[in-house]
Structures are given as structure tokens and as C-alpha cells.
């Protein structure tokens, strides 16, 4: 068997509708589009969200919230990401290892994943669950 000899089982695939190919095909003349009107024309359909001139729902509803610029400077680090780092882990070590973006000003370790080895954190914020996991693995946190 070769890829070029594989074919679907007979009758399992319907043949494509060939529209506008004569009266005998059943899809000639208007080709299933009906008579006149916007949807009978080439390119004749409205853009997504258009409601026929009525103010669209997206514009009727107010804008909500904002994106904090502070969040761009604070990064979260998962527990399993610490396993690949050696020595004392501080913000500079996290940036150097590309665990957090270079413009990060603060980092916080969150309890996600597993930590098998002992690590020492310095000057990095830690959640309660992450603190327990680090200490359970034999690590320590220096403020």
C-alpha cells in the first residue's frame, strides 16, 4: 500500500456540489443563492458584528477595567522552574537563567509543580504553599 493508492470507501464521501453548471444539475442559474438581494451578489455579506445599522452590542456596552502597568514588572515563578538553578537564587539569577523577563523588578514563587532539591531563595517573594514546599525539600528562604 502506498499513499497515492489510498482511497476512501466507495459511497463514503459525497461528491462536491458544482453550482452554476446548467439547468439539469439542479443548481444552475441562481446557483442556490435565490433571487437578487445582498446575499445573491459577489462579496455580499456583512462584516462580523454588523447588526444592520443598529448600534452593535460590542459598542452598546461600556468598556470595563484596565491592564495594570505594574503587572508587567512583577513575574511569577513556579516551583519546578527553580529546580534547574544552582546556588543562591535571587532576582538576578532568575533573569540570567531566562526564567523571568529582563525588565522584571520583582518576582514571586508560587506553589505549582514539584520541587525535589533544596534551594536557597534570597530577596524573592514566596506564597505560603511555596514556602512549605521549599522547606519540605530542605531549602531555605532569606528575606
From Swiss-Prot:
Q: Does the keyword RNA-binding apply?
A: yes
Amino acid composition bias (Gly residues), ranges on this chain = 21-31
Looking at the UniProt record for this protein, which Gene Ontology cellular component terms does it annotate, in alphabetical order? Answer: cytosolic large ribosomal subunit
InterPro entries for this protein = Ribosomal_uL15, Ribosomal_uL15/eL18, Ribosomal_uL15/eL18_sf, Ribosomal_uL15_bac-type, Ribosomal_uL15_CS
Pfam families membership:
Ribosomal_L27A (PF00828)
Q: Which processes are annotated in GO (biological process)?
A: translation
Q: Which SUPFAM superfamilies match?
A: Ribosomal proteins L15p and L18e
Which stretches does the entry tag as region Disordered?
1-51
Keyword set, alphabetical order: Ribonucleoprotein, Ribosomal protein, RNA-binding, rRNA-binding
Molecular function per GO: rRNA binding; structural constituent of ribosome
Q: NCBIfam families under this entry? A: rplO_bact (TIGR01071)
Name the protein family.
Belongs to the universal ribosomal protein uL15 family.
Functional summary from the UniProt entry: Binds to the 23S rRNA.
Subunit arrangement? Part of the 50S ribosomal subunit.
Q: What is this protein called?
A: Large ribosomal subunit protein uL15
* Record organism: Thioalkalivibrio sulfidiphilus (strain HL-EbGR7)
